[in-house]
Structures are given as C-alpha cells and as structure tokens.
Amino acid sequence: MEQTRKAAAGVTNPRYANGTLRRRNRARLRAMGGPCGICGGRLGPIHYDEPSDAAHPLSFVVDEIRPVARWRQFGYDSPRAAAEDFNNLQAAHYFCNQRKGAKTQM
C-alpha cells in the first residue's frame, strides 16, 4: 500500500528513473571487468556471471561511489543526476556494497 501511495505521488527510485541508461552503464561496467571498487579485489575477483544476491556474495553489483541518498552534499542537481553519472559508478561485490551502505568509504 505504501509503495502505491509513493508511486501515485510521483516519488520513484532515481536509480531506475532511466532504465535504459542504467542498463547501459551496468553493461559498460561489466564489460570493463574490473576489480571491486570497494575492496580493491582483496576478497577475490567479481563473479560477473552470478545473480546479484546474498547467496552469491562475490557477485557483481553497481556501486555508487558518492551515495545517491546524499546527492546534495556532493553537488548534484538531483538524486537522478547522481544515479546516472557514470563517473559516480563502480563495479563491486554484492557483499562489499551491502557492507558499505550509504557511506563513501568502508
């Protein structure tokens, strides 16, 4: 019910406001095949072919270097601008990203 009210009020998750760009950025990071931007690969390589969930802690997720939740603090015009800025994105392990939360560093 709460989700319905938020959607009706026009409040959406900025990460998914432009799904095409989000998928393109995700594919670009996947193609780059880099190490985890959070741990630097200390936990091992990112498993790019596994589902991104708790059962696969080394799986690939897109991490926002500067958290979207703190967009004003980092000088973005909107949460959507922070979520869509490729320079604000990095590949990460699912585990590392969950541990980092809305912080800029671990």
Please place each PLM-identified region on the residue numbering.
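Short intrinsically disordered terminal tails
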Residues: M1, Q105-M106
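Short, charged surface segments at domain edges that flank catalytic/cofactor-binding sites
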Residues: E2-P51, R80-A83
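Residue-level detector of intrinsically disordered/flexible regions characterized by low predicted structural confidence
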Residues: A8, A102-Q105
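Cys/His/Pro-rich metal-binding microdomains
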Residues: G37, Q90, Y94
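Short Cys/His-rich local motifs and their 1-3 flanking residues in nucleic-acid-associated proteins
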Residues: G41, Y94, Q98
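Histidine-centered nuclease catalytic patch
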Residues: L43-A91
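Short, non-ligating residues that shape and space the ligands of small metal-coordination modules
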Residues: P45-I46, R99-K103
